[in-house]
């Protein structure tokens, strides 16, 4: 059954319920009014952007979870996560032994050397006692339940093929480190964590989708140390100074090959800067919704190429903060040669986007990773279900 058919069924079901249970308006006249939840269900079922259209609106999603791996777009396209492995169900929210985690815990599953598609038995809040080190070929899939990870963040270091989907990560602290399980072997000594919700270092084929990220000690997502082929999509970033860092230092020349996509995300509720902040690499920032910022929205140094396409930039009211961009680390003349381009972007409330450089000639790899941009006027709709969402077995998401 396709998306349209599922939506029609849901629509007529909700309409029938409304007919049987009419409510009254403030004026006292009998009136059929859809609830907020009904409106959100219809909106979600519609699956508005290219990633969600790949899998949402299908009632059999629970029995075909691994089809999600075919839906990655941008530079993480082809990331399969744990598609070729077993489905592993997390049954416990405990994290009481980080060196030798018990079977049934998220830490045990994440450390395995084999591919796994990790799901959750029920709603749970996982209070991590140390950073969670995720091994290669894993999908962490929170669909069907509400999964929150707090206190500690996720670390993806020198790994490949990771999908993180529909997880709420918040209130992440710097943790002291120690002996931590990171693979099938003995635990290894880890230094203190940085306090990011998701830290990606030296890794490739990483897809972060439909996550809600907020309140961390440092940043929300850091991608550094030669990481590449990364897509951050359909996420909601809130209540944090620093959102996304793509390249950590102007001396890290290994990031010259970084390819990253930032697509269909919502930045709102007191996010100050780094949406993203880029160094060296090649970045497509496409169809995101920027609902004000503090210092700036998108920044960079070390001559990154940043292609902004079809975004909606709603500037803050402060007249000195209207600039979308921040160029740092060099003189004005040099930075104005960097290829920072704008196409189809919507600038609102006096937002200013000062382009520089020229339209680059794309390599075949760069061309293959580009997501077709819709006009900025569509960004609000395309990001309307960003972040985690409710999804029930037997019904379309």
From Swiss-Prot:
Sugar-bearing residue positions: 37
Signal peptide: 1-25
SUPFAM superfamilies: Pectin lyase-like
Annotated catalytic residues: 274
Positions bound to Ca(2+): 194, 218, 222
Pathway: Glycan metabolism; pectin degradation; 2-dehydro-3-deoxy-D-gluconate from pectin: step 2/5
Enzyme Commission number, as recorded: 4.2.2.2
Tissue: Pollen and flowers.
Classification via Pfam families: Pectate_lyase_4
Record's subunit section: Monomer.
Protein name stated in the entry: Pectate lyase 2
Species whose genome carries this gene: Ambrosia artemisiifolia
């Amino acid at each position: 059954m396709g998306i349209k058919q599922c939506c029609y069924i849901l629509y007529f079901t909700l309409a029938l319920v409304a007919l049987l249970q009419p409510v009254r308006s403030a004026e006292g006249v009998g009136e059929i009014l859809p609830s907020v939840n009904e409106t959100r269900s219809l909106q979600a079922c519609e699956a508005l952007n290219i990633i969600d259209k790949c899998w949402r609106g299908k009632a059999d999603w629970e029995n075909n979870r691994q089809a999600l791996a075919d839906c990655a777009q941008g530079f993480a396209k082809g990331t399969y996560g744990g598609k070729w492995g077993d489905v592993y169900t997390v049954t416990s929210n405990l994290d009481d032994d980080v060196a030798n985690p018990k079977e049934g815990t998220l830490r045990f599953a994440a450390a395995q050397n084999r591919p796994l598609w990790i799901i959750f038995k029920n709603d749970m809040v996982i209070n991590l006692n140390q950073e969670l080190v995720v091994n290669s070929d894993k999908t962490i899939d929170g669909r069907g339940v509400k999964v929150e990870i707090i206190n500690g963040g996720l670390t993806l270091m020198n790994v490949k093929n990771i999908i993180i989907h529909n997880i709420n990560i918040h209130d992440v602290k710097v943790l002291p480190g120690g002996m931590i399980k990171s693979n099938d072997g003995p635990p290894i000594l880890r230094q203190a964590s940085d306090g990011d919700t998701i830290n990606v270092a030296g890794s490739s084929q990483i897809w972060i989708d439909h996550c809600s990220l907020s309140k961390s000690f440092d940043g929300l997502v850091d991608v550094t140390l030669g990481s590449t082929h990364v897509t951050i999509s359909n996420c909601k970033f809130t209540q944090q100074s620093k959102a996304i860092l793509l390249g950590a230092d102007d001396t890290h020349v290994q990031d010259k090959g970084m390819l990253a996509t930032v697509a269909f995300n919502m930045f709102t509720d007191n996010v100050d800067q780094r949406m993203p902040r880029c160094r060296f690499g090649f970045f497509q920032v496409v169809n995101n919704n920027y609902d004000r910022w503090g210092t700036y929205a998108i920044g960079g140094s070390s001559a990154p190429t940043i292609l902004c396409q079809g975004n909606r930039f709603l500037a803050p009211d402060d007249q000195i903060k209207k600039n979308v961009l921040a160029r740092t680390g060099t003189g004005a003349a040099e930075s104005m040669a960097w290829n920072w381009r704008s196409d189809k972007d919507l600038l609102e409330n006096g937002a200013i986007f000062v382009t520089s450089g020229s339209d680059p000639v794309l390599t075949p790899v760069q061309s293959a990773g580009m997501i077709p941009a819709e006009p900025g006027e569509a960004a609000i709709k395309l990001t309307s279900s960003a972040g985690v969402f409710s999804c029930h077995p037997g019904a379309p998401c």
